[in-house]
Amino acid sequence: MSGDTCLCPASGAKPKLSGFKGGGLGNKYVQLNVGGSLYYTTVRALTRHDTMLKAMFSGRMEVLTDKEGWILIDRCGKHFGTILNYLRDDTITLPQNRQEIKELMAEAKYYLIQGLVNMCQSALQDKKDSYQPVCNIPIITSLKEEERLIESSTKPVVKLLYNRSNNKYSYTSNSDDHLLKNIELFDKLSLRFNGRVLFIKDVIGDEICCWSFYGQGRKLAEVCCTSIVYATEKKQTKVEFPEARIYEETLNVLLYETPRVPDNSLLEATSRSCSQASPSEDEETFELRDRVRRIHVKRYSTYDDRQLGHQSTHRD
């Protein structure tokens, strides 16, 4: 049994050195204060292996105790419970995190527990050999897969759709270069924000080059980079590179990293107040909601504000 209570000695009381006479105590419990974390265990568990703890509790080393009998060990107590489990059972389940394994190995080295040190070293080597990439970019294969990825993600989502097979016309002179720049910017952003944003590639959609931004499962904005122009007698597809707009929307989705707190009580309060509001207040509230809706709809326009492939809905 262990606790996390830090025991402070009484004013004027000083810890004292004493020899711990543990011979023949067997299953007697001792109380340990390891860096402020409190543990109870048996002398038998502490002396099963030839370690520094065995030297401490077999009388070969002096130990530091306070006036209440707690044996003080000046080490971090974070992993001491794991160390006790190893001393009792000769095996443990190691942490998954590499940093925590390193911390545990440092404590095992201090207490001279060679078996546990070997376990930690093997685990670290295995993790090194089976290294997983830090930045994974899913390529969606169906609309259902895309919906599931976005709905299940706890992070904001940035999706780049690029599909040259959707083009029916020839490209303008700079379109190939701009398409490549969009892809390069996507790669750059995914490396920069991979721990905070889920980046998705879509190569089966109906657009040629289009960015979509999601937060908390809903679509926030879209930047369509293509348009049809009449630069010559024939129609041509123009691909643009709205770099500043893409950066702006990417930074906007970072505002949705923290999940929203349910506000049912707030909704109830506002619904009650609205039912008692005057007609002028109702009109003002409707106007505010309408303004917000129009702002969001406007953000779905293309870079040059042409509604290519998207219907514009607004109120006059």
Swiss-Prot record:
Keywords: Cytoplasm, Endosome, Nucleus, Phosphoprotein, Ubl conjugation pathway. GO terms for molecular function: identical protein binding; small GTPase binding; ubiquitin-protein transferase activity. The modification Phosphoserine is found at residues 278, 280. Disulfide bonds: none annotated. Component of the BCR(TNFAIP1) E3 ubiquitin ligase complex, at least composed of CUL3, TNFAIP1/BACURD2 and RBX1. Interacts with RHOA; with a preference for RhoA-GDP. Interacts with RHOB. Interacts with PCNA. Interacts with CSNK2B. PANTHER family: BTB/POZ DOMAIN-CONTAINING ADAPTER FOR CUL3-MEDIATED RHOA DEGRADATION PROTEIN FAMILY MEMBER (PTHR11145), BTB_POZ DOMAIN-CONTAINING ADAPTER FOR CUL3-MEDIATED RHOA DEGRADATION PROTEIN 2 (PTHR11145:SF17). This is BTB/POZ domain-containing adapter for CUL3-mediated RhoA degradation protein 2. It comes from Pongo abelii (Sumatran orangutan). The gene is TNFAIP1.
